[in-house]
């Protein structure tokens, strides 16, 4: 799967808006993920106790993790598909230590698309959504290949 230069520009344009409030975006994305796919919360020992949206919003740890997730994703997106160096350690930790299934990466991708659309409707129309979906699918496909190399079926 290849994105055109124009598609990458759409992705990176909206990503600049994410980076302007990376903590807020990360928090919103994780809350949406955990609310719509509560099974994903079980992978996070330090968040399992957070049962309500209010508790999630009050959690500094959750906000910090959102920053970590989006910082890593931003570094990958900025490589425009040439993300081997960034992907390798991420795949290693997610396959061997955290055991995060690819399905969960699909779930967080859905949350990312939803949050970006709700926060930036003028900058995240159908073309930008399509480009971001392709970029996230490329990321998932490549991380799934790394998982396979590591012997994790995820």
Curated annotation (Swiss-Prot):
Phosphoserine carried by residues: 4
Enzyme type, top EC level: oxidoreductase
A Pfam family hit: Globin
Domain Globin: 2-148
A Gene Ontology biological process term: removal of superoxide radicals
Entry's Gene Ontology cellular component terms: extracellular exosome; sarcoplasm
Keyword Transmembrane helix: no
Catalysed reaction equations from the record: Fe(III)-heme b-[protein] + nitric oxide + H2O = Fe(II)-heme b-[protein] + nitrite + 2 H(+); H2O2 + AH2 = A + 2 H2O
UniProt KW Cytoplasm keyword: yes
Keywords (A to Z) from UniProt: Cytoplasm, Heme, Iron, Metal-binding, Muscle protein, Oxidoreductase, Oxygen transport, Phosphoprotein, Transport
Name under which the protein is recorded: Myoglobin
Taxonomic lineage: Eukaryota, Metazoa, Chordata, Craniata, Vertebrata
Gene: MB
